[in-house]
From Swiss-Prot:
Transmembrane domains' residue ranges: none
Region (Disordered) location: 128-157, 176-346
Gene label: Tle1
Taxonomy of the source species: Eukaryota, Metazoa, Chordata, Craniata, Vertebrata
Top-level division of the source organism's lineage: Eukaryota
Tissue specificity statement from the Swiss-Prot or TrEMBL entry: Highly expressed in liver and lung. Detected at slightly lower levels in heart, brain, kidney and testis. Detected in fetal and adult stomach and small intestine, in adult ileum, duodenum and colon. Expressed in bone marrow-derived macrophages.
Positions occupied by motif Nuclear localization signal: 225-228
GO cellular component: cytoplasm; nucleus; transcription regulator complex
PANTHER family xref list: TRANSDUCIN-LIKE ENHANCER PROTEIN (PTHR10814), TRANSDUCIN-LIKE ENHANCER PROTEIN 1 (PTHR10814:SF29)
Name under which the protein is recorded: Transducin-like enhancer protein 1
Phosphoserine found at: 237, 257, 261, 265, 284
Natural source organism: Mus musculus (Mouse)
């Protein structure tokens, strides 16, 4: 790793005995640190391998249990048939002649005398027949030559794993699997298995109930909270969750705190945070306030188990999650996995696809050569990754094409060909040339260019992707604002002095010009006490704040008064507002409503002047072009729409396969970034069909904001991450890990500060270092 010969330092003459110097000591420490990293990585791989083996064993257990249950049912059925036939024989025999009666009675008695030799012969014959029927899928599963193991005629013997799956499908109607898969990734997400009884006392592991659709959005209410203590382990399956609901991380919510009316729930940028991936059900008795859409929002439960640590900035290159959705899963029909699976096989196939997706490259023994892994500074800031982001993004076009083909193969098949263990690097993705597995840092590609026809290719980043004027090097946490409730909305004043944090029933104002201030300078009580603030926007003059949330009214605050006061309220027909936008001339306010409409308000006359109708479900996020002529909205109906504000009509519609939770329009034009429930970030060109697809988040992307220079943007997610990306191709500039879900974010007008709001009841202020 290091050259053997070093130039003599000023403290060590060339001819003097060897003497430790500070730089060499630091180098040695770095070597040991990287060795520990390698050990950690190998242990992590071993853990993942064991988890995969465990899952496979559970699958086989369920298959065999279904076999046993089906055989038991068939045995009882045949026994009952035999009894009824015996009764019929007993009734019919007396009508025969005496001679025939004796012959038939003897034949019946002989039929009842089945010897072990006959049983073995019958079983062997059935197995041979099944082997011919299985078309060479492997040897049949041997059955014990014992009456209790007699194979009934209705269920042929099975051959190999394919036959096991076939049997699972055949018997699925008899065994009502009540199972669920709660996957947790790395420190935040662990495999947790639960078992729930069925009407037939069938116990099966939870890892087989999940569907690929991770839509678990509960809506919180007081009666739900009362039920939670008794029923916290009895959660509905993921597939039953309302597609409209999101999850707010309220791991530290006071269990005794009051809850809101059951009509609303906290959403960030128009999204119900309760809609996010549900965590460990038994970890916390907490829940939060309610939800918003009157159309189809259901009341559910959630309990999110989070560690309440201070935000930690990662000191290594951001790495795509090992089970990340493979490229093309969002709005790329050409790469979707094939359909046509039998319904009963879907839980097993989905489980395999979720647990066995393969990364495009495999980290080597050391995460990266020395000098390529960014190290944390003395203040905990994250340094620029530099060359560590080269990876697949800087290789030759031929290699990129091969990697894209490998990605397509992973998507097409849904899982790796190796099941039950972690394959060695050279076996992970056969389509990738061997030399790609050894790229610097071993980092899989996380940014893909998608053409109009769905072709995907890893993006080769330009040399100035992470350097140049206006591109940050890292971000440093400088302040923590303890709001006391889940922070679903944040905004920064211009000039940068005050930060506004929206929580439950109030907006708190913080003076960040004096970092020592630990208390808000004022508190603006809005809506009802138990309803969450979903969005707050400052007018450019800095004297007016507009607040929306889980209520049908928007509050307009006069901040220039000696004491901030509400100077007007705007009332709409929708029960909740999920996001707000202000026109550049400050004359018009746009609100995203839970009924899918976009309300247009005249701020001077305080009247509703228009509604844009098009979203078929709640409108979750919104942004406006700098010239004030075009509006972009995202919705829970899986669409992004653009509107012409001069003509009052819809211009474009982009359809996706995932709900839209956040979006941002680049201030310099051309690019629109969209945050998905599927954990992807997609950057669309507003005039061309091609786009970029970014894969670094491990869960739902809850908020997104462009820097005012337009050269970079940030996104936050349920995975506790704050990611900074280069516009438009998504080179990762820096990454910050907080201690809970990051629900909201904002960037100051001078691009020097970032504020995030999180589920652990606080906002975090970062200074952007250039």
């Amino acid at each position: 790793m290091f050259p053997q010969s070093r130039h003599p330092t000023p403290h060590q003459a060339a001819g003097q005995p060897f003497k430790f110097t500070i730089p060499e000591s630091l180098d040695r420490i770095k070597e040991e640190f990287q060795f520990l990293q390698a050990q950690y990585h190998s242990l992590k791989l071993e853990c993942e391998k064991l988890a995969s083996e465990k899952t496979e064993m559970q699958r086989h257990y369920v298959m065999y249990y279904e076999m046993s249950y089906g055989l038991n049912i068939e045995m009882h059925k045949q026994t009952e048939i035999a009894k009824r036939l015996n009764t019929i024989c007993a009734q019919v025999i007396p009508f025969l002649s005496q001679e025939h009666q004796q012959q038939v009675a003897q034949a019946v008695e002989r039929a009842k005398q089945v010897t072990m030799a006959e049983l073995n012969a019958i079983i062997g014959q059935q197995q041979l027949q099944a082997q011919h029927l299985s078309h060479g899928h492997g040897p049949p599963v041997p059955l014990t030559p014992h009456p209790s193991g007699l194979q009934p005629p209705g269920i042929p013997p099975l051959g190999g794993s394919a036959s096991l799956l076939a049997l699972s499908s055949a018997l699925s109607g008899q065994s009502h699997l009540a199972i669920k898969d709660d996957k947790k990734h790395h420190d935040a997400e662990r495999h947790r298995d639960r078992e729930s009884g069925t009407s037939n006392s069938l116990l099966v592991p939870d890892s087989l109930r999940s569907t690929d659709k991770r839509r678990n959005g509960p809506e919180f209410s007081s009666d739900i909270k009362k039920r939670k203590v008794d029923d916290k382990d009895n959660y509905d399956s993921d597939g039953d969750k309302s597609d409209d609901n999101l999850v707010v991380d309220v791991s530290n919510e006071d269990p005794s705190s009051p809850h809101a009316s059951p009509t609303h729930s906290p959403r960030e940028n128009g999204i119900d945070k309760n809609r996010l991936l549900k965590k460990d059900a038994s970890g916390s008795p907490a829940s939060t306030a309610s939800s918003g859409s009157s159309s189809s929002l259901k009341s559910k439960e959630v309990s999110l188990h989070e560690k309440a640590n201070t935000p930690v900035l990662k000191s290594s290159t951001p790495t795509p999650r090992s089970d990340m959705p493979t490229p093309g899963t969002s709005a790329t029909p050409g790469l979707r996995p094939g359909l046509g699976k039998p319904p009963a096989m879907e839980p097993l196939v989905n489980q395999a696809a979720a647990g066995l997706r393969t990364p495009l490259a495999v980290p080597g023994p050391y995460p990266a050569p020395f000098g390529m892994v960014p190290h944390a500074g003395m203040n905990g800031e994250l340094t620029s990754p530099g060359a560590a982001y080269a990876g697949l993004h800087s290789m030759s076009p031929q290699m990129s094409a091969a990697a894209a083909a490998a990605a397509a193969a992973v998507v097409a098949y849904g899982r790796s060909p190796m099941v039950g263990f972690d394959p060695p690097p050279h076996m992970r993705v056969p389509s990738i040339p061997p030399n790609l597995a050894g790229i610097p840092g071993g980092k899989p590609a996380y940014s893909f260019h998608v053409t109009a026809d769905g072709q995907m290719q890893p993006v080769p980043f330009p040399p100035d992707a992470l350097i140049g004027p206006g591109i940050p090097r890292h971000a440093r946490q400088i302040n923590t604002l303890n709001h006391g409730e889940v922070v679903c909305a944040v905004t920064i004043s211009n000039p940068t002095r005050h930060v506004y944090t929206g929580g439950k029933g109030c907006v708190k104002v913080w003076d960040i010009s004096h970092p020592g201030n630990k208390s808000p300078v004022s508190q603006l009580d809005c809506l009802n006490r138990d309803n969450y603030i979903r969005s707050c926007k400052l007018l450019p003059d800095g004297c007016t704040l507009i607040v929306g949330g889980e209520a049908s009214t928007l509050s307009i605050w006069d901040l220039a008064a000696p004491t901030p006061r509400i100077k007007a309220e705007l009332t709409s027909s929708a029960p909740a507002c999920y996001a707000l936008a202000i026109s550049p001339d400050s004359k018009v306010c746009f609100s995203c409503c839970s009924d899918g409409n976009i309300a247009v308000w005249d701020l001077h006359n305080q009247t509703l002047v228009r509604q844009f109708q098009g979203h078929t479900d709640g409108a979750s996020c919104i942004d406006i072009s700098n010239d004030g002529t075009k509006l972009w909205t995202g919705g829970l109906d899986n669409t992004v729409r653009s509107w012409d504000l001069r003509e009052g009509r819809q211009l474009q519609q982009h359809d996706f396969t995932s709900q839209i939770f956040s979006l941002g329009y680049c201030p310099t034009g051309e690019w629109l970034a969209v945050g998905m429930e599927s954990s992807n970030v997609e950057v669309l060109h507003v005039n061309k069909p091609d786009k970029y697809q970014l894969h670094l988040h491990e869960s739902c992307v809850l908020s997104l904001k462009f820097a005012y220079c337009g050269k970079w943007f940030v996104s936050t997610g349920k995975d506790n991450l704050l990611n900074a990306w280069r516009t438009p191709y998504g080179a990762s500039i820096f990454q910050s890990k907080e201690s809970s879900s990051v629900l909201s974010c904002d960037i100051s007008v001078d691009d020097k500060y970032i504020v995030t709001g999180s589920g652990d009841k606080k906002a975090t202020v970062y200074e952007v270092i250039y």
